[in-house]
């Protein structure tokens, strides 16, 4: 496919990293595609909070913390034409991007200036799920380190041990990852 930028004569390259060799990603110069690793929390009202950014005092990737990737909120649109399915992605609402990314919508209906996606699969520490580095995923596997494997039906109860507004991977998390793959590598 061709991006809108390509149609304007602006060509960007995204090459995946291989092993320890970082790939090229021209997209990161744009806010929509630039991520910052953070510690985050979700309050009792369902609002996301960035508690610390990587490099700041108090930030850690290990232990009883939630590690995520924060980026600016975005809007999207999808056109299904006879020739192709066209995805639109923008930092603002337009005719082509009428829908906010779900993870950008606050519980009160306002649009957050940022959205957060977990960086790591949830692992178990003392019976509570944490998205932190080095944990075996609590995904139903029988690994000794997983302690309390989680089933599909038990995910809601398990994630709510952190608070009533925490959840596991959602269809919107998957849509975001797929959308980034389509935009950058299609």
Tell me the role of every PLM-derived stretch.
Residues 83-86, 117:
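Long, low-complexity, polar/charged, intrinsically disordered or flexibly structured peripheral segments
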Residues 90-186:
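Short aromatic-cysteine micro-motif
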Residues 77-83, 124-128:
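Short, solvent-exposed loop/turn elements at domain surfaces
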Residues 1-78, 141-186:
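Conserved hydrophobic ligand-interaction patch in extracellular adhesion modules
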Residues 69, 85-88, 103-104:
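Hydrophobic structural segments
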């Amino acid at each position: 496919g061709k991006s809108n930028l390509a149609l304007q004569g602006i060509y960007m390259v995204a090459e995946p990293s291989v092993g320890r060799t970082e790939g090229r990603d021209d997209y990161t110069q744009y806010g929509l595609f630039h991520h910052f690793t953070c510690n985050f929390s979700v309050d009792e009202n369902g609002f996301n909070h960035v508690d610390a950014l990587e490099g700041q005092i108090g930030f850690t990737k290990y232990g009883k913390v939630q590690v995520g990737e924060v980026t600016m909120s975005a809007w999207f649109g999808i056109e299904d034409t006879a020739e192709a399915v066209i995805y639109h992605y923008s930092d603002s609402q337009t005719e082509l991007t009428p829908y906010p990314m779900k993870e950008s919508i606050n519980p009160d209906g306002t649009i957050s200036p940022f959205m957060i996606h977990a960086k790591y699969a949830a692992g178990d520490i003392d019976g509570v799920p944490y998205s932190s580095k080095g944990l075996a995923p609590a995904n139903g596997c029988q690994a000794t380190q997983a302690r309390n494997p989680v089933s599909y039906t038990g995910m809601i109860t398990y994630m709510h041990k952190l608070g009533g507004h925490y959840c596991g991977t959602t269809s919107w998390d998957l849509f975001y990852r797929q959308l980034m793959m389509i935009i950058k590598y299609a």
